[in-house]
UniProtKB/Swiss-Prot annotation:
Entry's family note: Belongs to the MnmA/TRMU family.
Region (Interaction with tRNA): 146-148, 308-309
Pfam families reported for this sequence: tRNA_Me_trans, tRNA_Me_trans_C, tRNA_Me_trans_M
EC number: 2.8.1.13
Site feature location: Interaction with tRNA: H125, Q351
GO MF term set: ATP binding; tRNA binding; tRNA-uridine 2-sulfurtransferase activity
Subcellular location(s) of the protein: Cytoplasm
The protein's name: tRNA-specific 2-thiouridylase MnmA
Active site, per annotation: C100 (nucleophile), C196 (cysteine persulfide intermediate)
Biased composition (Polar residues): 372-382
Keywords per UniProt: ATP-binding, Cytoplasm, Disulfide bond, Nucleotide-binding, RNA-binding, Transferase, tRNA processing, tRNA-binding
Length: 391
């Protein structure tokens, strides 16, 4: 009887390497596949693609599996990077890793793996898949400190039915132990951080290669000009560092934070104090939705939600549709609202709002707007909250 073939996405890191080894030990016919998703800067100081490939080959030789490289750079630029730039240009803060998983790692990669006669694919993500009554559920990892279901919430039934996450039941510390015990050449390699195509380079420097600077006023809620920004695309909601007001002693003397953007007037609004009302939200509206089960939860469903990675689940109530002026959007586009029990800090348009029912990831959507702690205010795409005197 032939062994079941599993194609493993190998990045050169410890997690995907241990994933391949575990599956080989379990008797699967394992094939490693290295994805190259970015063409530029291959010889630059910030690009590790060449070394990553060397590490993949070394690991494959050690554990005794075949490995090949596949180039998805064109698909990545078309499906992920173009959207990344569009979102930043519109003043939002996107999460390209979420889109990369849905469009590249579990679509282009999955399609290629099937062409290699694979029955399943596997990655080193920390998450779990469970089949129940013919449906597939996406679950949090056993090690909640490493859980990556937030980034995987756009996966659908077809993708999950073909996916394995061997590390979902294993603590990260155990993964490191396994790597050392079997002598993996990359056992002590640091975990990768940041957006894959940016690497370790300064984010603002990278973004400036693709988006022009467009200076404008930096104002407080009462309309006072306190500085000049270099372009709204270069700032994100809740940002503290890099604003350029560190030495300013005006106002309360507390740290400054980015609180809103007004695209029409090219104005960046800043406030002082971590818990300023403009940084706190009890409600949000999200669009571009995706549900793991293929359908949304029931209207009024009480659940938990994350509005950023590694955030604790925040208790909230799900609404099938937003109400009021914020409900306006592209015709036919599904949207939802969340009403939180407690105010959430720096809910950022462009990021993902991901819903959970305990351990089960239900799916989510892209945050479009978030009502702040003051009546009549909202942080949304292209609009600043109402000025203080208008409250």
């Amino acid at each position: 009887m032939s062994k079941r073939r599993v194609v493993v996405g190998m990045s050169g890191g410890v997690d995907s390497s241990v994933t391949a080894w575990l599956l080989k030990e379990q008797g699967y016919d394992v094939v490693g596949l290295f994805m190259k998703n970015w063409e530029d800067d291959d010889d630059g100081e910030y690009c590790s693609t060449r070394q990553d490939w060397i590490d993949v080959v070394s690991v494959a030789d050690l554990i005794g599996i075949d490995v090949e490289a596949v180039n998805f750079a064109a698909e990545y630029k078309d499906r992920v990077f173009a959207e990344f730039l569009r979102e930043y240009s519109a003043g939002r803060t996107p999460n390209p890793d979420v889109l990369c998983n849905a469009e590249i790692k579990f679509k282009a990669f999955l399609d290629h793996a099937m062409s290699l006669d694979a029955e399943m694919i596997a990655t080193g993500h920390y998450a779990r898949v469970r089949e129940r009554d013919g449906r597939f559920e996406l679950l949090k990892a056993f090690d909640h400190t490493k859980d990556q279901s937030y980034f995987l919430h756009r996966l659908n039934q077809a993708q999950l039915s073909k996916t394995m996450f061997p590390l979902g039941e294993i603590p990260k510390t155990k993964v490191r132990e396994i790597a050392a015990q079997i002598g993996l050449p990359n056992a002590k390699k640091k975990d990768s951080t940041g957006i894959c195509f940016i690497g370790e380079r300064p984010f603002r420097d990278f973004l400036n290669r693709y988006l022009p600077t467009k200076p404008g006023p930096m104002k407080t809620p009462d309309g006072k000009v306190v500085g000049e920004h270099i372009g709204l695309a270069f700032y994100t909601f809740g940002q503290r560092k890099g604003i350029g007001l560190g030495g300013s002693k005006s106002g309360s003397g507390e740290p400054w934070f980015v609180a809103a953007k007004d695209i029409a007037s090219n104005t960046l609004y800043v406030v002082q104090g971590h818990d300023h009302p403009w940084l706190l939200s009890r409600e949000l509206v999200a669009g571009n939705v995706s549900w793991v089960a293929g359908e949304p939860p029931a209207d009024g469903f009480a659940c938990g939600a994350k509005t950023r990675y590694r955030q604790a689940d925040a208790a909230c109530v799900f609404g099938l549709a937003a109400t009021g002026a914020e409900a306006a959007g592209p015709a036919g586009e599904a949207r939802f609202s969340l009403a939180f029990d407690d105010a959430q800090w720096a809910v950022t348009p462009g990021q993902s709002a991901v819903l959970y029912d305990g351990e089960i990831c239900l799916g989510g959507g892209i945050i479009e707007s978030a009502a702040t702690g003051q009546p009549g205010q909202a942080t949304s795409t292209g609009h600043a909250p109402a000025l203080a005197e208008a409250r």
